């Protein structure tokens, strides 16, 4: 009976160890741009952590693209194609940008009804000092303009989240990713079909 108990216990331990080997464990470092990380990824990471309790997650939010090949991070969620093209890539979501303004600003300056109406408005653009998290953050400045001209800006901000706050405070209009505006007060989509 004792030999059978020992063998049974060994099999139990073996099964337990086998189960642990098949479950992911260790540290996982994920990087993405600041705005996507703080507003989209952070609220969603809890589900992953519940499914993988043995994984310690580290989130690095930086608008500079970290180099995965030098192990600065294990996973990168990029808003555009990474510079190092030898990565395994998978599209996660479509990110749409629209032009937004605050109700206070739009009441004072009017609601644009056409692309040409945008020429009468103040614009906030993505500024210098930090790399843009997307390919063309200031597309709205050229929208409908001829000869590659741009609309004049009244303010530049080197953070997409900063653009949102400037728009909400009534400084002007700006192109902002839709994921950043969900459930945000004091913001209205302008020309929603553009």
Language model feature labels by segment:
Residues 1-19:
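Alpha-helical "hinge/linker" immediately C-terminal to small N-terminal DNA-binding modules
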Residues 3, 77, 175:
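N-terminal Rossmann-like NAD(P) cofactor-binding module of classical short-chain dehydrogenase/reductase
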Residues 5, 35, 162:
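Residue-level recognition of oxygen-bearing side chains
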Residues 21-23, 146-147:
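Short, flexible turn/loop "capping" segments at secondary-structure junctions
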Residues 25-88:
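Central regulatory/effector-binding core of bacterial HTH transcription factors
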Residues 70, 82-194:
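C-terminal regulatory
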């Amino acid at each position: 009976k004792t030999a059978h108990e020992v063998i049974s216990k060994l099999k139990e331990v073996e099964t337990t160890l086998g189960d642990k080997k098949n479950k992911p464990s260790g540290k996982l470092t994920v990087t993405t741009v600041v705005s996507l990380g703080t507003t989209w990824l952070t609220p969603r990471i809890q589900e992953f952590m519940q499914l993988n309790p043995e994984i310690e997650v580290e989130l690095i939010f930086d608008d500079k693209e970290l180099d995965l090949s030098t192990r600065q991070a294990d996973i990168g969620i990029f808003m555009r194609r990474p510079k190092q093209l030898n990565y395994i890539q998978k599209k996660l979501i479509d990110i749409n940008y629209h032009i937004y303004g605050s109700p206070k600003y739009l009441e004072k300056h009017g609601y644009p009804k056409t692309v040409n109406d945008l020429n009468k408005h103040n614009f906030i653009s993505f500024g210098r000092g930090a790399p843009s998290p997307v390919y063309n953050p200031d597309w709205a400045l050229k929208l409908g303009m001829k000869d590659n001209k741009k609309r004049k800006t009244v303010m530049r901000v080197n953070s997409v989240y900063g653009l949102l706050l400037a728009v909400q405070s009534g400084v002007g209009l700006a192109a902002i990713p839709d994921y950043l505006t969900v459930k945000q007060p004091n913001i209205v989509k302008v020309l929603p079909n553009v």
